[in-house]
Amino acid sequence: MQIPQWSDLAPWTKGSAAQYAPLAHDSDTDEVESGLLSTEKRLPSATARGPITNKIVATFLALLQQLWMATRPVILSPHGKRKLHPTSWLDGVRGLAAFFVFFSHGIDVRWSMSRGGWTHGDFFLRMPIFRIFYSGPGMVSVFFIVSGYAISYKPLLLARAREQSKVFDCLVSSTFRRGVRLYFPCAAFVIIGALIKYCHLEYRPKKTDPRAESLLSTIWWMVQVIIPGLNPLTLDRRWMNSTFKDFEPVMWTIPVEFRGSVCVFILILVVAKASRAMRLGALIVSLAYLTCVGQWDIFLFVMGTFACEIHHRRQLPTHDEHETKTTNVFSRVVRSIGLFLALLPITFLLSQPETMWKNGDVWLYDWLAAHTPGAWANNMEAGSLWRCAAAVSLIFLVEYSSTLQKFFMSRPIQYLGDISFMLYLLHPWLLSTIGKRLVHIIFPLTDKLGWGMISETIGVVILLICFMPILFWGSEIATKFIDRKGVDFARWAEDRFYGVQRPIGPPKAS
């Protein structure tokens, strides 16, 4: 869709020399017709508006066009074939996990009791496996493995090629930019959130925070959130007590991401010059130690590094080469059945209810909780031993399954991957300002239908139709103007700090 150009508009809208000319008529012309003609001759011409007004209108239309081009949704934008690489599935995994985290918070708006475990007679969506799409803690465990994998890919590839100087340069650059990459969007959303609280835009907040009563107190609150929140060294395994978490609960993961990333960079720096066997052994020893002490977050990041090292050692063939080896129908069926059976225990563990909501009648969850090692017993929900084990299993299953890789490389899932970070940070604010309002408008109307669960389902469908476009479009805009600008700023700051001159424009794909 394009905004019409000023030059395309009708001539009478421009400051041209177009004039109204009287139509020729004779004395036999009807009086009514003559009256119409005389009326038209009295209408003001376009030139009466003046050149300044014309310029203002033209500028306004041009601005509208630029605004539309900058913010139009992806679905309305032209796009060619997407270029994929062997690990594009990581973006898909991250995107789908972020989408599930949104659902885990969205159900709190009206269906918070659904977070509890399934009991006999409950709705089937509360059963294990079915509840995976709103099981947030397990998705966070997946996040951290994917992050460890992604940030390890290039330096490990260089280490295997014995390009030690490039490994060092890569780690220096990654370490410098990682903090900016993570904290720049957080600072932006703290400012946005502070404005929302100061302007009382949240729908029926549980309580009005006194720190947002005045503009000055709101600014001071932002400072108290951002400055201490940058410190990743004060986090404990149970509560991850970051000030970001106090301001907006989902932001607790950001300091954890930064700390885990730095640990991965240091570990790769240590093992980069070692032989391949020694490097793999060092990673295994590190994982064993982290398992013994229950340091779950670092364990997940290092596990991502380990999975990346395995990926490089395997040197996977392309999907086309792989598919030619499995053209036999029977082998395809066997592989599909095996994949399905492998996914069952993984999704079962990832969909375990949070401790505060109890496990319901699913006795196996209670058994697993009772048999959790002491070093892991006091971790937060995302740090549960069994969730972490399931997240690790999922990543390795996708690594070895071309079928799952194709799913996570599909265009809709890749789209979620593109906006995953902003979707994760933005959705709580959209839920508190727009989502709750929609719920309190839609469901009183659908409840009047008196059809029980059917009425509730109709309300859910209407709610999703209204809210999802807002969520996706908002995430796209935030990705373009916050996330990518943060990446650009990190590169700019790195160039200025190290005195590096790079060509202007986006970096070339490596």
Per-region residue spans from a language model:
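Alpha-helical transmembrane segments of multi-pass integral membrane proteins
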Residues: 339-484, 506-510
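Alpha-helical transmembrane segments of multi-pass membrane proteins
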Residues: 101-113, 350-354
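Membrane-proximal cytoplasmic C-terminal regulatory module of class A 7TM GPCRs
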Residues: 2-15, 44-79, 323-326, 410, ...
